[in-house]
Amino acid sequence: MLTYKFLLIKLTATVLIIFPTLSFSVTVNDELRFATQMLSSGSMISLESAENSALMATVGEPKASLGHWLRAQSLYGLAGVGYDFDKKDRPFLEEARVRMIPLPNNLLPGNIFTFQTANSNSQYVLLMETSAFRLFVYKIDEFGNLSYENSFYSSIGLSGDNKTKEGDKKTPIGVYRFIKEISNPRADGFLGDIAMTLDYPNAQDKRDGRTGYGIWIHGVPKNTYVRSPKASDGCLALSNKDIELLKQYITYKKTHIVIVSKVSWLDPYTWKNNSKLIQNLFTSTSQVAGNNKNKVVAYYRVSKDRPSVALIRRGEIFYRDYWDETNKGLKKLLSERLN
C-alpha cells in the first residue's frame, strides 16, 4: 500500500533529468502536468495550486480521469487526511509519473537530421520517445532546419517497446511512413474515430526476423480522455482531440515517424555540426558520391544496436537506405524503395 507521502517522493524521484518546460498556450495536458508537479511538492500553497490546476483540467476536459484523481488527492492533502493507495490507483500513479517528465527546451533531437533539398518529401517529421510516452512533431524548413512544432502524450504497447514478434503487445522501434487513414477502425469505437497506419514491418525489420503487422496511431473510446501509459496492443494511442490535431502534420506515403526508446537531445550548435558531418560522410561515400541524381533528404538514428536510416531521393523515387556507422565511414546494408 502506498501512502500519500510516499507518492510525493516517488513522483519527484522519477524525474532524473530536468529540462525547463517549453512556453506555449496552456492546454489540458499542461494543467495536468502542472497539477502533478505541484502535488509532488506537498506544501499547502502547492496543494492549492494543484487543486486549482486539476480543476481547470477537468473543466477543459471532463473525461480527464487523472484530473479528477489529482484534485481528490489535493483536497485530501489540504484537509490533512491520510490516504492509502491500492491497485485501482496504479493507472493514475503511472500517468502522473509520466506527466512529471518535463519537455526539452531549446534542444534538438540527435536522432533526426534533415537537409536542404528541393522536393524534400514532407514538411514535418515525427519522433516518438517511448520512455517518455511523448510524440514530438518537428517542422522542416526550406534550409533543412528542424524546429519544434507540437507534442502529444501517447500510450504505447502493454508490454513496452522493441517489438520482435506478432502478438507480443510491444511498440516497434524504427523508422516508418504513414500510409493511409482508416475511419472508424473498430466497430465498437474502442480505437476512436480515426487510425493512421504505419508501414511496419520495414525492410530491416523483415531482414532481422521481426514479425507482426497493423501498427497504427489511433484514438481512444469516446468516454475516455487518454489511456494509461502502457495500454495498447503495440500501437500508439492518443486522445481523440490530439489525433485530430496530429492529422494536419501528416502527408500520407511521405511523412515519417522515428520511434525510439530514448531521444538523444543536442543543443542547436551541436546538432548543426553533426548534420554537416553526416552530409560530408555521404559525400565521401562511394555508393552515393558521383551520382547527382541521389539526394540525401534526411538521416535517422534509431539506437546504437540498429542501423541508421537515410531517406534518399533518386530522381523522382524515394528510398530508405539502411547503414552501419563504422570507424571507416558508412557501410550500406539494405535499400528499400518507397512506393
Predicted segments, located by residue:
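Short beta-strand edge/turn micro-motifs at domain boundaries
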Residues: 309-339
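Alpha-helical segment of the N-proximal tetratricopeptide repeat
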Residues: 29-56, 60
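Alpha-helical linker/edge segments of TPR/alpha-solenoid repeat scaffolds
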Residues: 75-109
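Gly/Pro-biased beta-strand-loop elements
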Residues: 103-215, 221-225, 331
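Exported/periplasmic cell-wall-interacting domains
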Residues: 37, 74, 180-280
